[in-house]
């Protein structure tokens, strides 16, 4: 045994050998192992008469001997093994070469290939007819936004939809929702990737890895998208699925000698049969024995690898034709490879045709998501991998469950063919087997609970149970496999294309996935009752009854109808297939721009019926995923949309829902609207009722509120975890169905939409609990679970548990959204399931949640219940200022919620580290009608926060409210809620940023929101449902306050520091109203529409034009944000959108005509239009006051728009973003001009606008901020004034906090900021925010697109790749000139607020960094000018 002292002595001996005397002395004195030596050490450092060796050998000798030994061990053994292997390999290769070299062999091979192909086709037809087991799976990788990070494998739950009319082809429909961590964009793009375009192509791809001909088959099945996908796909998930298939096949082959023999025969036939020459026969004689043994056994590779494609195909065909291999083919779904070929062929030939039930776009289908086209290329390749991997698993499952596969009806296919031409290649057509007409397998990454994607909306209850049984089994295997993969993929709540299940059995279930060119255009139109696909332009209002949600927003929205049927089978029970009708309007901005009218809102509202899929949501939960920006805009439209959600939910719930769970309970009251913002922040929305009472939960829930915690979809294990919980839950009774409106969006406008949607729903008579969530786009992995307690529509001020009469029913009524973190999720989901009925389950996996279930309040209209739930993973991250009563943070623990006493506790943001028990009065400031603003769990909203969601709960009245332990904070929402404002945290820089409220209502400081877009959007979401066009118009002060972020003002008053209060005004819902309010408001509203953000209107009406423009800009930026995430990362894009929104709003405020022009431009997203609008702004006499600012804004917007537009052109929805940016820039410019003369550079303008936002908003706060946004306009105004001054410094801090990299970015930009700082300090915060956002966006865009360290380079490349129109160049030149002109003014501003400017520049860079179609070069030019 070697002791430490032995080592020390050896070292000492070495030192003495080297005569290192001083080192020896030091070593002896310091070494604890030589203490005894120290007593006898001489001055020279030597120990006399001491043998410093081990076994007579010193250190050098020992080491030399050791090295010699090791070299002997390692060197001798390798050559023998390697040489033998190499010899065998050489031998087999030489044989193959000689064989292939013979011309006769080649000729015969071709003939064999032709005949074999023909034979294979015949056999496939027969097999498909005889074996419906080969399920059609279409791989639809879902690319979320950009792939800022190599997307975790998009979870693909591929469930055989049923065979296509061509029985021979089995397609796997795999919807991959991959999302980058930060670029989680909801349903940004759906890629339909052929499993294998051609057998040969697959063979070539797979040949290197083929082990057997069966494995070849498998491989071929995977290979088509496989090769491209592998780059992006999570290697583990893909490997797992592929390995499963290969292992199964391998086991079968190894266990069956006859199969091995036949395989060898088939191989030898082709290797030998063509060799008629003497040499060839000799070789062939060897081949059967040697090649097979040498290659297959030693190398584990089939000899075919070295054969030509034709030879491989021949062998494969021969094998397939052999009935003995039928089981193997079933394993791999041998038809899959054929189907893949057919799919690619049929898709290419008939993208819209019905015969391929699926229309596959090119593997580059990602082009579908136009706004993220740059990302599309990355995402596409990544997605196909998902498809392939899922295909493998699915084929196995499908084959195993062959009885489940039904032949898809031609009708369905035909219906699919209806998909719009623009979507043709991008359209995902899935015909469900007639039996399962409504059954669809969708991987809905954003909704972990929906993760099973055994979402078969069986239009018929009959079909549902039956299909549920059939598919449950398949799903059990498939889901498990797919879930394994799904959990890897990060997907926003973009639902994969899922088939809509026509309510009528007659109508084949057609899932329409329209992928618009625009980033937000990706439309998943799943029409349930109406099999027809609604055109993107068609508005929901027009077709309220039709499931195809808002077609107008379809471009911007992904419409997803996922039907999970109650778990009839054990697997299905796991999945608890919930019929989920999810219309996800990813591009909230696009939606806003598209649906400036209520139609937008309608389209935004997505009906989602979630029946304990993933969650043990025992009952159907109709979740409308949508930004529902304008949901309240038009009562009729809203009613239509509500009706759609409501009616479709009911009809589909009842019809599509498993017969077990009729959706009768899913009535308007019961419908749950889950609005997932354009950002994929809420990638996964898992509705997990307590497992114990899954059915009961849903049942009691519908009338009552549901508490759901929503986590990001990123937690990969969550899917699997969710599944088990769903397994626990039993079928969901129709009575168990709970209807909630869950709005998950990073965009502030979405939050406004929630209010609008609630108002609309109330108008429609659809009192649905509304949950407004900000999706955690920035740190999807960190995404805190958003816990939402939804009070029932009619229960006013009643907590969810209070609403539920029975404790058991309450437990049942609780829907817990699992947080995406898989590990925490699982435990908490189970725990959440265990939640007692008395407690609204606040399930926080990563962090505390704030579950605020506001009581219905008149402010919100009929849909009174608004729940804002926030999950803060790292409460400590919150600043101490957040610790004020304003912010309530529910500390989250990995431990089950039931076990934890913490969930009941409300912990103020970590800074204060104070914990409020839910029972205790959280804050004297909280009033029953309190507004709760939840910042998104994006990247640290506050500097100290990491992926936490600051939640500020502000009560207008200041009444204390206590929440019973374990209950979510029950915040009765009154008008103050509508006036959502995040109280300014005592730490203005951080908490304010976290709030994302930059005095938003009056001070369009939504740059913060941009940074925190997801969180801000939550704040914005803070139930502006009440705000309706009419309400906004009539009660500018009041409802604008309410709908816009007035509450911050009022709420802020109760808050500790009014100056810190930043009001988040999301006027998207109020855009029309704002127009009515006044020209400025009209402009703002128009801009809002353009930006697809209605919030600006509210902002403008609430505050004077100067203040309003910044708010509008911020809002618009937030609105733009959803498109940007598609382009970049969600959060980044959200930021840029917010900035652009603000700019746009300010521009809009400049003049109504300009607004109209800008809105038009936004719609067109043409730089020329933007230039025209800018010119008009300059020309318009109305702009005389703000002309300079407007011009600056116009220039900025032009430049931004130009950059954005180029980006937009690349990414379908960019155009909206560009317009938004330009408008926001204009707004900021207007503000700037108020303070100073017009500046020309867009970047300068943007910076100035940002500064303007901060300073102008402050000024406006002092003057306009008191605007009636908040019901208590007077107090709000005073508070606003305070916040203006205070916000100046904090805003930059907030911005830095808001942007994940804001802090870092600020210092680099400081030199640039002075030159481009706005004329007044008012814009300093905005400028900082803009700069920070821009930098973040650029960096994230670069990361997501190319994962390279040079985001600008990547963006530049992308921009260059996209054709730059000469008009854009001209516009850029004009903008540059203008920017130069504005330089002096910006410099003046910089003198006043350089620090703010730095931050602003950073933010500015982020939002303007290629928000959508922005040219990198142009963008850089503008930045340089600003610098």
Swiss-Prot record:
Bias-annotated ranges (Polar residues): 218-231, 628-644, 695-711, 1097-1114, 1348-1365, 1383-1394
Annotated Pfam families: NPAT_C
N6-acetyllysine carried by residues: 1228
Entry's Gene Ontology cellular component terms: Cajal body; cytoplasm; Gemini of Cajal bodies; nucleoplasm; nucleus
Effect on the protein of changing residue 10 to A: Impairs activation of histone gene transcription
Positions bearing Phosphothreonine: 1270, 1350
Region ranges (Interaction with MIZF): 1-318
Composition skew (Basic residues), residue ranges: 1396-1406
Keyword Cell cycle recorded: yes
Keyword hit for Cell membrane: no
Consequence recorded when altering residue 27 to A: Impairs activation of histone gene transcription
Residue numbers of Phosphoserine PTMs: 207, 554, 599, 775, 779, 1100, 1151, 1200, 1254
PROSITE patterns: LISH
Effect of residue 775 to A: Impairs activation of histone gene transcription
Domain annotation LisH: ranges: 3-35
Molecular-function GO term, any one: transcription coregulator activity
PTM info: Phosphorylated at Ser-775, Ser-779, Ser-1100, Thr-1270 and Thr-1350 by CCNE1/CDK2 at G1-S transition and until prophase, which promotes association with histone gene clusters and stimulates activation of histone transcription. Also phosphorylated by CCNA1/CDK2 in vitro.
Biased composition (Basic and acidic residues): 1140-1151, 1276-1285, 1371-1382
Mediates transcriptional activation, as annotated region: 262-338
Primary role: Required for progression through the G1 and S phases of the cell cycle and for S phase entry. Activates transcription of the histone H2A, histone H2B, histone H3 and histone H4 genes in conjunction with MIZF. Also positively regulates the ATM, MIZF and PRKDC promoters. Transcriptional activation may be accomplished at least in part by the recruitment of the NuA4 histone acetyltransferase (HAT) complex to target gene promoters.
Subunit description: Interacts with the cylin/CDK complexes CCNE1/CDK2 and CCNA1/CDK2. Interacts with BZW1, CASP8AP2, CREBBP, MIZF and YY1. Interacts with the RUVBL1, RUVBL2 and TRRAP subunits of the NuA4 complex. May also interact with GAPDH, NME1, NME2 and STIP1.
Family note: Belongs to the NPAT family.
Record-given protein name: Protein NPAT
